[in-house]
């Protein structure tokens, strides 16, 4: 397996890195574009014709009638290669860290340990070397030539003093690192924080402990939402008794048998939808 594996010298695992590896480039009147027509052969023998507009920065999309080109790491040679195979030959954590920056895959959190007792984290995959990621369109005149280069100077952690590393399938990094490598989105940190808390509950771990950690479904993150919903429903106990009963017996877990968990999760989702729906509607109008 590639996502998790071992060569008996090191063991590794990957989770999504959520780094910013794309910029929208605002094209100007002098920007050269051209159309490419492609034919996609389908399994049933039919052919789907597809046309797209390209530029020197990447494929072009019109937003509010203005052309923007998507400059994306996946379109760069450094982001697609077979360097990942070198991980199989690594004998130590240091070997794996040395390989990480050269590997051409979508950016992942590399977690690696070795038989000598070392452990480390580093972002593995193609990252553009441009120094200022932007959440807004970048003027074509300000396009950085560093987009053509892979970022070799990237943060890593090896053998932390507290003896613990975790990712939880989410973005990892300091506030300073985030200013350089974000914002490529993020996964909610609830899972990461719960893994962190579990790791600090013990000083020694067996394989079964890590397996139990993977199966940990305690709904810690939703506990405040559970309390809030229960408070609201208890304002009319007669009308809401069946829901109150479900919440009082929710088992505090993401269990298939927990009706209360489903109520709390959907309650949180609905509150967020109500609060942000007007903003989302306005953004959709602006995007046409």
Q: What are the functions of these language-model segments?
A:
Residues 1-241, 245-254:
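Mature extracytoplasmic enzyme cores
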Residues 237-288:
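A terminal-accessory region detector
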